Amino acid sequence: MWKLKIAEGQNGPYLYSTNNYVGRQTWEFDPNGGTIEERAKIEEARQQFWNNRYKVKPSSDLLWRIQFLGEKNFKQKIPAVKVEEGEEISHEVATIALHRAVNFFSALQATDGHWPAENAGPLFFLPPLVMCMYITGHLNTVFPAEHRKEILRYIYCHQNEDGGWGLHIEGHSTMFCTALSYICMRILGEGPDGGVNNACARARKWILDHGSVTAIPSWGKTWLSILGVFEWIGTNPMPPEFWILPSFLPVHPAKMWCYCRMVYMPMSYLYGKRFVGPITPLILQLREELYDRPYDEINWKKVRHVCAKEDLYYPHPLVQDLMWDSLYICTEPLLTRWPFNKLRNKALEVTMKHIHYEDENSRYITIGCVEKVLCMLACWVEDPNGDYFKKHLARIPDYLWVAEDGMKMQSFGSQEWDTGFAIQALLASEMNDEIADTLRKGHDFIKQSQVTNNPSGDFKGMYRHISKGSWTFSDQDHGWQVSDCTAEALKCCLLLSTMPRELVGQAMEPGRLYDSVNVVLSLQSKNGGLAAWEPAGASEYLELLNPTEFFADIVIEHEYVECTASSIQALVLFKKLYPGHRTKEINIFIDNAVKYLEDVQMPDGSWYGNWGVCFTYGSWFALGGLVAAGKSYNNSAAVRKGVEFLLRTQRSDGGWGESYRSCPDKVYRELETNDSNLVQTAWALMGLIHSGQADRDPKPLHRAAKLLINSQMEDGDFPQQEITGVFMKNCMLHYAAYRNIYPLWGLAEYRKNVLLPLENN
């Protein structure tokens, strides 16, 4: 039986932590673990997922939940309640439903105070890791038999009916992820016609029917070249000389978005080396299986710009293709020959210096899973027996996650992000005495997860921003500051500081709060919006150089509605509790941030959500930020338009249901199913409550709350539905904790702000 381990790790030469591994999540397989009942539940969960895999694509994340609830002997003692047709919701019924949700969710808290959860969904995360382990000869040690079994389960569970795999678990089939998944199955031991339901044969047919892997996007061309089933001359150049350009140039790496920078850093190293893994019998077989013509007859130069239409979200502009062609025809031939190859060697040396710096400052977690595998492979190419690679191996378990649909690779974990919202949801329930231990542990986790130092050495010279006082998306070891993660954690610390110490623990020291405020203030742009990781400000025209085909807006850092709104709320609360600290700066910050939210509102009254689906998510954040800054339905046209949008999109069952297609299409798309999405319903409900809807017409709120109450399960859980997270416009991300956090929070705000005033009258 698989078991989730929390905050475990032994300090040694290859594994170390800045805060004793608080927040770390790792899975271990115990062949003798679990009771007969627990094993039966897990098998039932696996079978149910398989049977419904085309209806509900995200997992319900049940394995660790079964484990935790069993360890705590949790039993829901409060009977379920339902609101009948035509019946009004009483304060008592809302309290019972909320109490049940709070009881259940509190039981899911880990020993270190955070809430574990899957944070995955993209189907290009895991295969490169498997490929990397195959190339380096560590496949069987990193992925023993039970790991391989669960990886294959995941691949089978998310194969589309047409035989392919999407960019993410809810997406249409793409060449990129179909080819990667096929290769992954073959590496893990499946034959050309093997796999459950003829998985390999169906996948290969899809690939060949759609033009073969010559039509794979650029990232796929890179990985296949590394593996040896594609040729580097069929890829666009990624010159490592980029890292030794003068800093005044507009295309300097310091001006790039951190994730773009961190992907192309190791990619350019591997490209500069023209590294190719061992050509094994399997690689030779793949060369035959993945193409519609003999491998040695392919004109590689002609396939550089070829991309399957199923993968193409961002068509490259002509200026970009001209740039690649210039580098390919003119620059690369020079840089690979004497004496210019000396410049190439210098560039490779500098690039590797940056890779090591980033690895060390993230404790070898790196900024994310795509970057992790590339940096790890680059370290192996530099020195297969070196300590750098061994340190990378020690952090692979941090990325692996097991659920009823198998083993997948996480983005890098959402521990801090989820916990920040979880604490706010629980505080809104006003059941503080009953859940004091839960709040105290959550408070401790947040305090222990704050980043306490800037990156090491001359961090600005390594293109890094301040991080002292920030919070990351995951844990302290990760090290990368994020504005909204910082703002949400800061809100928690401020709210908890107003409560009795004996109830929730020692308040965070003011100096550490000041450090957090400093980070948030530093990330505001001239237009008033907040960037996420680093200050924005590079020229927008650089997006014309976006080298990917399936993402948008990845070259430079941008401002985001959610980051801006979270930061407004945090600083308004901070100003109230610490009125003497940087007051003038904070006032200016809030005014400019409000103007940004007003400026980016869509014509239909909504706001585009960059990290959740989509206009519902963005509108909840924006309304919360505007109201916190003193805007209201009466004095703000933006608030009125936002409210009208939410009311207009409410469905007949009282909920909201927005399709993930809204994100790439940038237009509101309703779910095609009749059932509303409970997470989105909670977002919209809270957005309307922020705006004072209860005073105008509470009926839409009652209808939404009724849906949440009636959808609650027997144990106090809520059902898993459609995926609700997103990044880079076109790729969805499964936040498994959202189905608990937001319905609970929505009911808490409803009970506190809608029902209580009515009862007091």
From Swiss-Prot:
GO molecular function: beta-amyrin synthase activity
Entry's Gene Ontology cellular component terms: lipid droplet
Broadest EC class assigned to this enzyme: isomerase
Catalytic residues as annotated in Swiss-Prot or TrEMBL: D484
Superkingdom of the source species: Eukaryota
PROSITE patterns: TERPENE_SYNTHASES
Any one Gene Ontology BP term: triterpenoid biosynthetic process
UniProt-listed CDD domains: SQCY_1 (cd02892)
Entry EC no(s): 5.4.99.39
Tissue specificity of this protein: Expressed in the leaves and in the epidermal cells but not in the inner tissues of the fruit.
InterPro entries: SQ_cyclase_C (IPR032696), SQ_cyclase_N (IPR032697), Squalene_cyclase (IPR018333), Terpene_synthase_CS (IPR002365), Terpenoid_cyclase/PrenylTrfase (IPR008930)
Catalytic activity: (S)-2,3-epoxysqualene = beta-amyrin
Ranges occupied by PFTB repeats: 148-189, 513-558, 590-630, 639-680, 701-742
Keywords associated with the record: Isomerase, Repeat
UniProt function note: Oxidosqualene cyclase converting oxidosqualene into beta-amyrin, generating five rings and eight asymmetric centers in a single transformation.
NCBIfam families in the record: squalene_cyclas
Family note: Belongs to the terpene cyclase/mutase family.
Protein's UniProt name: Beta-amyrin synthase
Gene assigned in the entry: TTS1
